[in-house]
Curated annotation (Swiss-Prot):
Belongs to the UPF0180 family. Signal peptide: none annotated. This is UPF0180 protein RBAM_013970. Disulfide bonds: none annotated. It comes from the Bacteria. InterPro entries: UPF0180. It comes from Bacillus velezensis (strain DSM 23117 / BGSC 10A6 / LMG 26770 / FZB42).
């Protein structure tokens, strides 16, 4: 089953990298968007700007601050292995 990764809208380079690795990527516009994700990637500029950390999701949240798209992909993969 394909893992669903939620990302913030400003992370379009990460979106492409994750899609190339076979993940189903969705843009998180509201905290509700994070609820069905297997993992969430946020910018970290304001760690809770969308309320992602407060949602009922049990998915891991990765802060992308200072990381390349490849590094973020590696972190996502670590969460599932």
């Amino acid at each position: 089953m394909t893992k669903k990764i939620g990302i913030e809208q400003s992370l379009s380079d990460v979106e492409q990298a994750l899609k190339q690795k076979g993940y189903d990527v969705v843009m998180m516009k509201t905290p509700e968007d994070a609820k069905n994700c297997d993992c969430c990637v946020v910018t970290g500029l304001d760690s809770n700007v969308q309320g992602i950390a407060d949602t009922s999701t049990q998915a891991p949240v990765i802060t992308a601050s200072g990381m390349t798209a490849d590094e973020i992909c590696s972190e996502v993969e670590k969460k599932f292995h």
